[in-house]
């Protein structure tokens, strides 16, 4: 009681929704739809790739018809499994793209962000996409340092 889940003997309890009273005091009483899975594993959650399993469940791959593929299978990729590329979008300013990533396993991590496209500069930004520091961009690769569970926003122009 008081946590999101509890296992006792052969019983399992799982909290599916928690809701505040603002702006809707009856949100927890309305109709909701959930997708959840039980994912048994022998090793620690990090080694069992639990974050990847959750993404596969909640955001399945969608095939679309497209033009000629580029040299990469994605617009961007990282070389560390504990770094999750969360967002790739056009910059709010209309110039460049934003790539948002986070560290998922509570580990200080250095990763190489590989991007497809012709970009001249890379910046680390805050969540409002305001440039804070320039990053080295060489041959489509940007080295990014992430603190445990940190969200990092990179802008490429």
Where do the model's predicted regions map?
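Terminal accessory/anchoring regions of large secretory-pathway or extracellular enzymes
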Residues: 3-4, 8-157
